[in-house]
């Protein structure tokens, strides 16, 4: 998820 990896926006949350 994005919350786990700040900087990557491939997660379900932008």
Curated annotation (Swiss-Prot):
Keywords assigned by UniProt, alphabetized: Amidation, Neuropeptide, Secreted
Tree of life domain: Eukaryota
Secreted recorded as keyword: yes
InterPro entries with a match to the protein in the record: Pyrokinin_CS (IPR001484)
A single GO BP: neuropeptide signaling pathway
Residue positions, PTM Leucine amide: 14
GO MF, one annotated term: neuropeptide hormone activity
Keyword Ribonucleoprotein among record annotations: no
Cellular localization per UniProt: Secreted
Reported tissue expression: Expressed in the brain, subesophageal ganglion and in the retrocerebral complex (mainly corpora allata).
GO cellular-component term (any): extracellular region
Membership in a protein family: Belongs to the pyrokinin family.
Function summary: Myoactive.
Name under which the protein is recorded: Pyrokinin-6
Organism the protein comes from: Eurycotis floridana (Florida woods cockroach)
């Amino acid at each position: 998820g994005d919350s786990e990896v700040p900087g990557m926006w491939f997660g379900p949350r932008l």
